[in-house]
Each structure stands twice: as C-alpha cells, then as structure tokens.
Design a protein with these regions (language model features):
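A conserved mid-protein helix/loop that constitutes part of the nucleotide-sugar donor-binding site
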Residues: 18, 222, 226-245, 264, ...
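Glycosyltransferase donor-sugar binding loop
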Residues: 227, 254-267
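Carbohydrate-associated surface elements
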Residues: 180, 203
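Conserved acidic donor-binding segment of nucleotide-sugar-dependent glycosyltransferases
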Residues: 340-344, 348-355, 364-370, 385
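A short, well-ordered alpha-helix in the C-terminal region of glycosyltransferases
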Residues: 357, 364, 371-398
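Nucleotide-activated donor-binding/catalytic signature segment of Leloir-type glycosyltransferases, i.e.
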Residues: 267-288
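Acidic donor-binding loop of glycosyltransferase active sites
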Residues: 295-310, 327
Length: 403
C-alpha cells in the first residue's frame, strides 16, 4: 500500500475546482491513500456527483473549538517554537492586511490539523494553491516535520504573493500547471525554484466528452459556449460585446455562459445590447451537464483578460474540456493559454480585452468551419497527448514515490 497523502484545499466542495477532485480520485485508483483536509467545508447548491463521497470523509477542523484550544495549549509547552511560528507568519504577511487577518485565523487550527495528521500517520502533504493551503502545509511541516508540496495555479502566484518565497523554498517540490508558471516563479523567486518545479497539468478524462464533427450549416444558428466563474479576469463583458458585433453583422447566434457568480452587471449589458435570448447566463452546472452542453455547441470561447491588479488565468481546464469535445477554440493570448491553444495549430488566439478582434475571429470560425474543425481535431489530439488526467497524475505519483 502506498503512503498516506493529506490534500489541503481552501474549500470543499467547490464546483470550479473539479480538477482537484479528479486528481484525488485518480490517485486513489493508483493505490494511494488520500486524506482530504479542507480549510472550509461549505454547502453549495450544485455539487458534482464525484464530490458526494468525499464530503463525509473530509477531515474538517473548525476555526475555533475545544480541540483547537487544546492543541494550542499543548503547543505552548514549547513556547519558543510557538512564538516563532506566530512571529514569522505575522511578519511575512504584514504587507497584506487580508492575508494577515486570515493567517491569524488559520494559525490556531493549523496546530490541531498537525495533531490529527500525526495521529493518522500522514507521510506527506500536498496543497493546491500557494495561498492559504500552502501556508497551513508550511505550518504543519514546521510543527511535525511532515514534508509538503504545492500545486501552483494562477492568482496564488500572480497576485497574492505574501510569504510566497518561504512557502515555495521549503516545499519538497512544486507542481506547476504550465511552463509559463515555472518561468514566472524562477524569475520572481530565483533559479533554485525552477529546479524543483515540475509541469503537472490539471488533466481531463477525454472519454467523458463526445468528440465529433459539428459544422454549422449555412443559415444555422451559430452555437457559442463559455465555461467559467463570473469573475472579472474571465473577461465576460468582452464576449458579450463581441456577440453584439456579430449580431449587428447579421450572424444568427446563441452564446451560453456557464458559471457561478454575480450576474447583475452582465445581465444589464445583455439588455442594453439587445441580446436577450441570444446571450444566456446559465449559472453553475454539474459536470455531466457541462459535457452535454459542449456536445451541442459549435465553438468554445475563452475571453480572459489580465486585470489591473494582475489577476489572470493559469490554463483554464474548460479549454481542455472543450478540445476534448472536438470544439474549435478561440481564446486570448495570455499566461499559459498559448501552451494549449497554439495559434493556427490547435486553435485561435486574439489579444485580450479586444471585442472587435474576438468578433472577427468568431466570424471566421463561422464562415470557414472546415478549417476550424481541422484545428479542433489537432486540439483534441493535443489534449489526449499532454493534458490527459491519468498520465499527469502518474507524473505526480512518481514525485510522491521519490520522497
């Protein structure tokens, strides 16, 4: 039997982090024992069926409880270590008020989580995101000596960088979802980080999706789809503007946007542009429904941007799902996206925050569907070669075996 790995994630279940769920399931299929330690155990209106079996297994530690108080009292028996952990954590988060406040809340429960992991025989910790999960992994490592690793994604290294260098340097290894991320970290932290950073993509299971040729016939409604939470860096306003341009050009279309978040401002844009019944905000959907909706579409769009604060994508898993479904992809040329959407090879790239360029490229997909589908087939093949779940999890498992 393989060693027991503790997975730390910010919140569970979380609809937009299905890729972590898939990774844990695949590791278990490979014989690893996985213990889930979410920092927040939350209720959601839509929960993937695969997540249901993990909910009762989650080792959730409340922020304040008798057990947390007891664990801290025990830790105080070594006052110098206790004070040093508090001092270093608060000092390294001092320039980020939000992180400082959250660190003060997470620190007490980290002592109890460390106690539980020792009792459970955890041999290694893997944290998804270099923010709060990595902080707790680092704290437990300092308390117990249990090694830890981190998967870095996007906002956790591009924007929220409090204590980032410490968390990365003390990690046994780092898994980056893109080459872009690895080079970014090497430039930010130093070349030593590059040496222990490995490319582990957030993979998909291609067989989950129906990959078939779907060419829009002349006069047929052009079915566009996007999947992603309604956050500013996803660029949905530019997609709506592009749809308005296409509509003004006389192209009959429907654009379905799947994802949770506030819809008020986007709905207002849709009404002002006269796109009611053309652009549909469908809210969060379970994975099987996402797969079904992809199978009824002609083109996938990823209009992501870089926000003024620097927030941007890593490599959206939704693009992988769209490619696995055989869809042509139009995306913006930011962060790690060009590693998947290779211009005129596996898809189309346009500048971010440019609705006219986005509309022009979508129009080309509509008017030349044969070429678009040639790229779609190449994209589907690339996903199967480099972004398939099992092969990426095998690379991660190999790193665990080398500990």
């Amino acid at each position: 039997m393989n060693s027991k790995i503790a997975y730390i994630m910010s919140r569970f279940p979380h609809l937009s982090e299905t890729f972590i769920l898939r990774e844990m399931n695949e590791l278990e299929r490979h014989g690893w024992q996985i213990a889930l330690y979410p920092l927040i155990l939350q209720k959601q209106p839509v929960v993937h069926a695969e997540a249901e079996r993990w909910i009762p297994r989650a080792r959730y530690v409340p922020f304040f409880s008798a057990e947390v108080l007891s664990a801290n009292a025990r830790a105080l028996l070594k006052p110098h270590r206790y004070a040093a952990l508090w001092g270093r954590t608060l000092w390294e988060n001092r320039n980020c008020p939000n992180f400082l406040a959250r660190a003060m809340v997470l620190l007490p429960k980290a002592f109890q989580m460390a106690r539980l992991m020792e009792q459970e025989g955890i041999t290694h910790i893997h944290a998804h995101y270099a923010t709060h999960p990595a902080l707790v992994a680092w704290l437990i490592h300092r308390l117990t000596g249990i090694s830890y690793s981190i998967t870095v994604h996007a906002h956790d290294i591009f924007v929220r960088t409090a204590m980032l260098g410490t968390k990365l340097r003390d990690a046994t290894f780092i898994a980056a979802i893109s080459e872009f991320n690895r080079e970014y970290l090497a430039n930010l932290i130093g070349p030593s980080v590059r040496d222990k950073t490995h490319i582990i993509h957030c993979g998909v299971v291609p067989s989950t999706y129906q990959s078939r040729l779907r060419l829009p016939k002349e006069g047929e409604r052009f079915e566009i789809i996007n999947v992603g939470s309604l956050q500013p860096y996803k660029g949905h306003p530019y997609l709506i503007q592009a749809c308005a341009i296409l509509h003004q050009r006389g192209i009959r279309l429907r654009c379905r946007i799947i994802g949770g978040g506030s819809q008020d401002s986007l709905n207002q844009m849709i009404v002002q542009a006269g796109l009611e019944g053309i652009v549909e905000l469908m809210g969060p959907q379970p994975q099987h429904e996402v797969a079904r909706l992809l199978s009824t579409s002609h083109c996938y769009v990823q209009p992501s941007i870089i926000t003024p604060s620097g927030k941007m994508e890593g490599i959206p898993v939704a693009i992988m799902e769209a490619m696995a479904s055989g869809l042509p992809v139009v995306a913006t040329s930011i962060s790690g996206i060009p590693e998947l959407v290779r211009p005129e090879q596996t898809g189309y790239l346009v500048p971010p925050a440019d609705p006219t360029a986005l509309a022009d490229q979508l129009a080309k997909v509509y008017t030349d569907p044969i070429h678009a589908n040639q790229l779609a087939q190449a994209g589907s093949a690339l996903v199967r070669q480099e972004f398939e779940l099992s092969s990426n999890v095998e690379r991660l498992a190999t790193l665990f075996e080398q500990l």
